[in-house]
Amino acid sequence: MAALSIHHFRQAKQAGQPLVALTAADYATAQILDRAGIDLILVGDSLAMTSLGHSSTLPLTLEQMIHHAQAVRRGVERAFLVADLPFLSYQVCKEQALLSAGRLMKEAGVNGVKLEGGYPDMVETVAFLVQRGIPVLGHIGLTPQAKHQLGGYRQQGKTPSEAERLRQEALSLERAGAFALVLEHMPAELAAQITQQVGIPTLGIGAGPACDGQILVTHDLLGLSERIPPFAKAYANLREVIREAVEAFVGDVHQRLFPPT
């Protein structure tokens, strides 16, 4: 099974082949996703909420991200593996971003990193990393690390000025060398416009069907999350399946039916 390279993503866009991306934070999940044919596996900072029980992504540390990315790496053979840079592991200066990204590549073996935002300083940071051989996945629209500044998990790009800002951010990140862009929680029409104007692939999450691919949080996809965003879809209800299995085990033990005699 040949591992996917960074070239796969632009080739897929040119061929009109939709890309599929999901998140993973542990070995078993990563192995399942990889064998299912996922193009990109993201060790997302959403693990702060889905795996560690925090109310936002902000508490996640770089050390925790490295720990989870190492586990995911062991389960991935084919997919392109990207890790989020946690809050305050890259915003101080571009040199800090380089050290954080470098540690994730050296210690966890990821193929690239994801940074949130498309403002001028962040575009400069993206270019700085790319010039030093680090593939970067951009992320604009709703950027969860900025939830307080944005006033919560609200749709972005609804006004003409916001939409124009996001279009310009997408172009700037492409020029900086990002290999793809995550477009999160923005109007479908705006995401379609951005997808048409950039030469790199777009991965939508709550951004309509016209993006070059789609990305979801795996816990949402599998019905493991307590609350699923309105733009996501649960393809299973594993929360209920797991509960029923555990309750069946508890019942068997209480009735001395397990282990069998």
Swiss-Prot record:
Keywords: Cytoplasm, Magnesium, Metal-binding, Pantothenate biosynthesis, Transferase. GO terms for biological process: pantothenate biosynthetic process. The keyword Flavoprotein does not apply. 3-methyl-2-oxobutanoate binds at D45, S46, D84, K114. GO terms for molecular function: 3-methyl-2-oxobutanoate hydroxymethyltransferase activity; magnesium ion binding. Mg(2+) binds at D45, D84, E116. HAMAP family: PanB (MF_00156). NCBIfam families: panB, PRK00311.1. It comes from Synechococcus sp. (strain JA-3-3Ab) (Cyanobacteria bacterium Yellowstone A-Prime). The active site is at E184. Its cofactor is Mg(2+). Pfam families: Pantoate_transf. It catalyses: 3-methyl-2-oxobutanoate + (6R)-5,10-methylene-5,6,7,8-tetrahydrofolate + H2O = 2-dehydropantoate + (6S)-5,6,7,8-tetrahydrofolate. Homodecamer; pentamer of dimers. This is 3-methyl-2-oxobutanoate hydroxymethyltransferase. GO terms for cellular component: cytoplasm. The gene is panB. InterPro entries: Pantoate_hydroxy_MeTrfase, Pyrv/PenolPyrv_kinase-like_dom, Pyrv_kinase-like_dom_sf. CDD domains: KPHMT-like.
